[in-house]
Amino acid sequence: MDMQSRIRRLFQASIDTKQQAMDILAPHIEQASLVMVNALLNEGKMLACGNGGSAGDAQHFSSELLNRFERERPSLPAIALTTDSSTLTSIANDYSYNEIFSKQIRALGQPGDVLLAISTSGNSANVIQAIQAAHDREMIVVALTGRDGGGMASLLLPEDVEIRVPSTVTARIQEVHLLAIHCLCDLIDSQLFGSEE
């Protein structure tokens, strides 16, 4: 297969996964946006975590809220728990890598805050511990997962929201996660500041 054909195949696989996910995920993304907006209206904040590409997604989400998404508006409170290398390495060194997010949540999380927990497999041990810590702090969890939801899915409470991408391919799951994050940012802005359409 020549390279351009391979590129077209990858584009088509991404398109197919997004089309399959659209109707399945729309109600879950809507519900997640309502949870987040309710928290923001009640002086809550967003915390976000994940590993690798999912860490990048957590940072992307928090930066879109803190700075701006597609229009000028006031900054919104969001913290990516993936960015402080001194904190991450001290917790990993002194305790366990599995606690790098949960210890931060126990310090920063408040009742009514929202945790955006991201894992393509749903089985990242440190994200699972983050969900447990969020529940201990009476936070609501929005979980971005894939495959069968993994261990994260079994931890979620009725008030939590899972956005589970219907795919087993990590790259496709990540692509839909990013689109879901952009949908959340758009919905948050439109609910808080009105639609620009």
Swiss-Prot record:
Cellular location(s): Cytoplasm
Domain SIS: 36-197
Positions annotated to bind Zn(2+): 60, 64, 174, 182
Name of a matching Pfam family: SIS_2
UniProt keywords, alphabetically: Carbohydrate metabolism, Cytoplasm, Isomerase, Metal-binding, Zinc
Alphabetical list of InterPro entries matching this protein: GmhA/DiaA (IPR035461), Phosphoheptose_Isoase (IPR004515), SIS_dom (IPR001347), SIS_dom_sf (IPR046348), SIS_GmhA/DiaA_subfam (IPR050099)
The record's free-text note on cofactor binding: Binds 1 zinc ion per subunit.
GO BP terms in the entry: carbohydrate metabolic process; D-glycero-D-manno-heptose 7-phosphate biosynthetic process
Gene Ontology terms, MF aspect: carbohydrate derivative binding; D-sedoheptulose 7-phosphate isomerase activity; zinc ion binding
Metabolic or biological pathway, per its Swiss-Prot or TrEMBL entry: Carbohydrate biosynthesis; D-glycero-D-manno-heptose 7-phosphate biosynthesis; D-glycero-alpha-D-manno-heptose 7-phosphate and D-glycero-beta-D-manno-heptose 7-phosphate from sedoheptulose 7-phosphate: step 1/1
GO cellular-component term (any): cytoplasm
Enzyme Commission code: 5.3.1.28
Location, primary (coarse class): cytoplasm
Cofactor(s) recorded in Swiss-Prot or TrEMBL: Zn(2+)
Protein family: Belongs to the SIS family. GmhA subfamily.
PANTHER family to which the protein is assigned, alphabetical: DNAA INITIATOR-ASSOCIATING PROTEIN DIAA (PTHR30390:SF6), SEDOHEPTULOSE 7-PHOSPHATE ISOMERASE / DNAA INITIATOR-ASSOCIATING FACTOR FOR REPLICATION INITIATION (PTHR30390)
Known partners and oligomeric status: Homotetramer.
Purpose: Catalyzes the isomerization of sedoheptulose 7-phosphate in D-glycero-D-manno-heptose 7-phosphate.
Note: The reaction produces a racemic mixture of D-glycero-alpha-D-manno-heptose 7-phosphate and D-glycero-beta-D-manno-heptose 7-phosphate.
Name of protein: Phosphoheptose isomerase
Gene name for this UniProt entry: gmhA
